[in-house]
Amino acid sequence: MISSEIGGTIEEILVDMGDKVNKGAVLLRLDQREAKLNLEIAQKTLDKNRVQLQEARNNLRRSKDLFEKGIISASERDNIQTQHDIADAQTAQSESALNLAKKKFEDTIVTAPIPGEIKKRHVSKGESIKDKVPL
């Protein structure tokens, strides 16, 4: 029995009953619009956080020099270190969010897990399905 990892609306069914399929053959596609939008948002968020992390690295490097010269206090240097650490954590979180968005986008395409023959079909084009429900 084949099921989808995610729920959604069936956009296209590429096989009929009786069709023989190879492992990895595309069986159906779910509507990808929301998954694609989430993927784009995750990528842009990561891009933004990488820029902020680079700026925080630059500020941290400058703050160490300024601290050694006695121009800024230890407290100011520590605040800049904290801002760097926050930017680093946000970037890591954004990378995880992007990986999740990629997985969900990939899951909009349902493929055959093994070679075989399509014996039954429980869904139709345009139908909304839930995750893990037999297709």
Identify the residue ranges that each predicted region occupies.
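Short beta-strand-turn/beta-hairpin segments enriched in glycine/proline and small hydrophobics
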Residues: 1-5, 96-113
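Short, surface-exposed secondary-structure boundary micro-motifs
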Residues: 26, 32-33, 77, 134
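Conserved strand-loop elements at the edges of beta-sheets that form or border functional pockets
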Residues: 2-4, 29-32, 41, 110-112, ...
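Alpha-helical coiled-coil segments
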Residues: 34-103, 121
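Surface-exposed patches in structured soluble domains
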Residues: 11-14, 20-26, 104, 109-135
